[in-house]
Amino acid sequence: MTAGLYSAGLYIPELGHLAMILALCFALVQSVVPLLGAWRGDRLWMSLAQPAAWGQFAFLVFAFGCLTYAFMADDFSVDYVASNSNSALPWYYKFSAVWGAHEGSLLLWALILGGWTFAVSVFSRQLPQVMLARVLAIMGMISTGFLLFLILTSNPFARILPQIPADGRDLNPLLQDIGLIVHPPMLYMGYVGFSVAFAFAIAALLGGRLDAAWARWSRPWTIVAWAFLGIGITLGSWWAYYELGWGGWWFWDPVENASFMPWLVGTALIHSLAVTEKRGVFKSWTVLLAIAAFSLSLLGTFLVRSGVLTSVHAFASDPERGVFILIFLLFVVGGSLTLFALRAPVVKSHVGFNLWSRETLLLGNNLVLVVAASMILLGTLYPLILDAMTGAKLSVGPPYFNALFIPLMALLMVVMAVGMLVRWKDTPVKWLVGMLTPVLLGSAALAVIAGIAYGDFNWAVIATFMLAAWVLLAGVRDIFDKTRHKGLIKGLPTLTRSYWGMQIAHLGIAVCALGVVLSSQNSAERDLRLAPGESMSLAGYQFVFEGAKHFEGPNFTSDKGTIRVIRNGKEISVLHPEKRLYTVQNSVMTEAGIDAGFTRDLYVALGEPLGDGAWAVRVHVKPFVRWIWFGGLLTGFGGLLAALDRRYRVKVKSRVREALGMSGATA
């Protein structure tokens, strides 16, 4: 750090630390005073919830800005900066390094939680004051827990004094990638966002009323959190594919599982909220799902930060930190389930529905998703529990997860399509058969045509084509049914954003499933030695290796290969895979050369140099792999579109007042 910058920013870290303490003070006020106000019926005390939320968020923004300044100014007197940055690191990686390790990522988590709290306080003013006070108080309690954890065990502003290092130890080379600038914030937006659904559920339990108005207010927040988490998972898969050099996009890594489980439960939650909003049923089940979604988010935090597992995603962390999070997790789960047990008798549903109804299909959807999440939870935690109890080492790998998860997802797609077509409360069987018959016949025909066009009659491929067509055609059939009275042209503009969001999200699932199966079943791969001038053929492509040249990067040295790709005598691409040595950490990284296409990726990675200019080279041809991430982004976009539906913003105040009451409820 230069003398001028150091002089100008001498006390910036101390100001950042003070801002975290002040944010904690506001969080404590937000946790206690409004809740007491709701219990006493004191409007003044309840009204303090919003300014407390704003103050907490403002100080967290300031603290985050102070840490960002420390990175940009190369303030290596700050231990966290010295451990995760370097003067030669490009500025954009210095910025992403702010959340590149445990302490900074936890500050980002607290900031995003403060942001969600601020958003709820601003956009939920139509809520009865007592309900809003309870919601913000619950979120304040969560913020208090994380801020205590941050300040007591994980201070990102701790100094290295008096011996300040001349330079930093650099950011982990795995994290020096554009994908890691956006992947963690998106993931945290989802993780933390489920705290809103949790807070609404607990607040409604405290008031003793869960009905359509509560579900309507919870649902858009839950959908947004779910969409961000899905986008974050998708970006993480894309990053792993091109950055790790293995050519894979999902490894059933424990930390991948830790993010996937709350997404699955969140998917069940948004569908259950839809039933509660529309029909007033599944209230207890919906509350349990809200508790489970946020609890699984906390479990993911524990797995990443406790040191109990080894993963490319995990932070090297003091196990004592894991104990703090585990206690917090047990407090959240135990406290919320105890409250649920006390309040459950007053939130029972008394509305009936028949077997062939949308309620039944959505319940089936919920059960499949919860079973899938439970199966992943068992496979993730069992090795850890076995190790803790017996010391035995066991690895649960892809064969277990694939054998159980794939059939469940196939069943989910079947239920998904039928669920779009059935009616609420009761559906005449004859009418439903009439709706589904053309969908089934069309799906079978499209699957056969697609199989012929694709040139592969592998049963898994044909089944996936049929399931994807089943979902697509069911959606089209439902659109025609919804617009039959006005006609297709006049009827389409009358369909709501929520409806279009649902259709796009379901389409995204179908597209993603096609990408998963086609890329997994039909990928081609070869590992071999190539010297300059030599070539190899794979899946109809010829790869000509022209050698590798050495060059210097800003904080690394690289051997960059050149590989020409030829098909039918015509050059279609030139790929430049790299082998990088990050000099500060003496860490070797592989940067794949990828020619991305709509129907296939050509993927080349350099292995080790073998002498005389020859290299070990890994070549993949991956059909339709991009469809995995395109489908994931479609699903996330569908969720965000659905959350913008006008019905979440109009004619709500009167319904909420009627359902929850303006006063008189006890906390």
Residue ranges and their predicted role:
Residues 3-44, 62, 76, 254-262, ...:
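Contiguous transmembrane helix-bundle modules in multi-pass membrane proteins
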Residues 21-35, 39-42, 105-237, 245:
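A conserved hydrophobic secondary-structure block that centers on an alpha-helix together
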Residues 39-60, 119-143, 206-227, 252, ...:
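Membrane-interfacial loop-to-helix junctions in multi-pass inner-membrane proteins
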Residues 56-71, 139-152, 289-297, 366-377, ...:
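Hydrophobic alpha-helical membrane-insertion segments
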Residues 61-136, 151-171, 233-277, 300-323, ...:
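Membrane-interface helix-loop-helix modules in multi-pass inner-membrane proteins
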Residues 96-97, 172-177, 599-631:
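Short, aromatic-rich amphipathic segments at membrane interfaces
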Residues 526-618:
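Soluble non-transmembrane domains of integral membrane proteins
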